[in-house]
Amino acid sequence: MNKVFKVGLIGCGHIAETYFRAHKYFNNFKIIKCADVKSEAAKKCAKTYRIQAVSVNELLKDKRVEIILNLTPPKVHYQIAKKSLLNGKHVYSEKPLAINLKNGKELLKISKKKKLYLGNAPDTFLGG
């Protein structure tokens, strides 16, 4: 049996719907929790997709969550990705990875040091 990775989604805006719709076609990961700075957005997402809504910090500290799906606005991709990596989580982010080269290189350095994967969508959900 293949491993099923437990994913925490951060950023419950419009693009999150696309990921939830596409996620049912994959059997190697499961979105188990969501968070958003707007708690009402997280609660709505959680209710719709029958998962748990938590704060960003709770999600990052949850030992069951292995991968963070970063769907936040571009200006905060770097901050969320960095916090995720520093909390021992693999990260898959919507584009762009960071809004400048310096921050992008820093994320790569952290991911290599901690032996974590850092991925970035070339287009929404691999074109899904």
Question: Model-found features: residue ranges?
Answer:
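N-terminal Rossmann-like dinucleotide-binding module
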Residues: 1-49
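Glycine- and other small-residue-rich loops at beta-strand/loop junctions that grip anionic moieties
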Residues: 12, 70, 96, 121-122
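Conserved donor sugar-nucleotide recognition element shared by glycan-biosynthetic enzymes
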Residues: 15, 19, 52, 77, ...
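Acidic-histidine catalytic/liganding microenvironments
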Residues: 26, 62-63, 127
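Short helix-capping segments at alpha-helix termini
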Residues: 26-28, 87, 112-116
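Hydrophobic beta-strand scaffold residues
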Residues: 31, 53, 91, 117-118
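Beta-loop-alpha module in the N-terminal Rossmann-like domain of NAD(P)-dependent dehydrogenases
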Residues: 51-110
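A contiguous active-site-proximal alpha/beta segment in oxidoreductase catalytic domains
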Residues: 98-128
